Amino acid sequence: MILLGSTGSIGQNALSLARDFRLPVEVLVAGHNLSLLNAQIAEFQPKIIVIADSSRASELSLPKDSKLLFGEEGIIESLHLAQSSFVLNALVGFLGLRPTLESLRLGKTLALANKESLVAGGSFVDASKIIPVDSEHFSLWFLKSDKPFSRLFITASGGAFRDTPLEEIPLQKAQAALRHPNWSMGRKITVDSATMVNKLFEILEARWLFNTKSVDALIERNSLVHALIGYPDGSFSAHIAQADMRLPLAYAMLGKLDQPLGPPLELERLAALSFEPINPSRYPLWNLKEKLLTHPWLGITLNAANEVAVEKFLEGKILFGEIPRYIERSLERFSMIPASIEELFALDSEVRQFAHKL
């Protein structure tokens, strides 16, 4: 396995499965958590390791005959050097797009947890060759058959501020936004869950993966129903499972799963099941949903502006309520359709420069 993003929550879950099912790991790619990476290296003995910063190379304890690479170019080189045919892209942010494109170009099997690859680069990615790892898209894939459908639904937990009084939400700081009610995730995706940007991303991902604009989302507070498919006859199918990222990862890594990964879901827990609409008064960015489905190339601008805003928010430079302004102003300024992957990367850079000045 080639694991891009080994020290994040997805990467750690993937390595838990690799341990349980004795799967070899050839490549580990990580950012700055080198203490955890060292523990992973000691256990899995990868042949190739990639880290973000070459100046920290001395902090690593490397296996004999292993190769150490650095940065984005190192990630791409590792894809070429590795013999493994399976790639799990669990990188965070726009950084994940180029490795996605290169993995597919090299004919490798790609399990995708990097949302931004499709959000920003969906026009240039062959989504039919991707194994989805997001719990929602895995659930749609699990449910989907040749039977015609009328609508796809994914679910949201509502994030950290789902019950916060509306007037208090704009004043919130990072510490409060990082208290997700259901999932243990990375910092950026937890903030994206609170703004509902994460669900906008997933709506766009579903559009590319399943080739439909008929995608919507609902709040299901327990994170037990991950997706639903509506049929022309008015009936629905739902995928119900524990909130455990190892389930979609297991199908991606193993191809199938014929044993439980944990205790079975107690059906009594479904007694309190309910679905709520996503209220734009609480999640103002949700107003962008139809615009993004109609003009999916705007995902490039959405993603770039959001990354800048979330970084500033996590650094304490802006309050939670200022995040939408960065995105809305950027979308007002940039609406062009990139004609090539080079234009896409140029647009991403231009949006970031604009957003940094806001």
Swiss-Prot record:
Q: Which gene encodes it?
A: dxr
- Name the cystine pairs: none
Residues holding 1-deoxy-D-xylulose 5-phosphate: K115, S135, E136, S157, H180, S193, N198, K199, E202
What keyword terms does UniProt attach to this protein? Isoprene biosynthesis, Manganese, Metal-binding, NADP, Oxidoreductase
Entry cofactors: Mg(2+); Mn(2+)
**Which parts of the chain are coiled coil?**
none
Q: Which GO terms describe its molecular function?
A: 1-deoxy-D-xylulose-5-phosphate reductoisomerase activity; manganese ion binding; NADPH binding
According to its UniProt entry, one GO biological process term is:
isopentenyl diphosphate biosynthetic process, methylerythritol 4-phosphate pathway involved in terpenoid biosynthetic process
Q: What does this protein do?
A: Catalyzes the NADPH-dependent rearrangement and reduction of 1-deoxy-D-xylulose-5-phosphate (DXP) to 2-C-methyl-D-erythritol 4-phosphate (MEP).
Which of the seven top EC classes does this enzyme belong to? oxidoreductase
Keyword Nucleotide-binding attached: no
The answer on whether this UniProt entry bears the keyword Metal-binding reads yes
Q: Which residues cross the membrane?
A: none
Its Enzyme Commission number(s) read: 1.1.1.267
Q: Which residues bind NADPH?
A: T7, G8, S9, I10, G31, N33, N114, E116, G186
Q: According to its UniProt record, which reaction does this protein catalyse?
A: 2-C-methyl-D-erythritol 4-phosphate + NADP(+) = 1-deoxy-D-xylulose 5-phosphate + NADPH + H(+)
- Which residues are recorded as binding Mn(2+)? D134, E136, E202
Query: Could you identify this protein by its name?
Result: 1-deoxy-D-xylulose 5-phosphate reductoisomerase
Q: Which NCBIfam families match?
A: Dxr
Family membership noted in the UniProt record: Belongs to the DXR family.
Pathway(s) served: Isoprenoid biosynthesis; isopentenyl diphosphate biosynthesis via DXP pathway; isopentenyl diphosphate from 1-deoxy-D-xylulose 5-phosphate: step 1/6
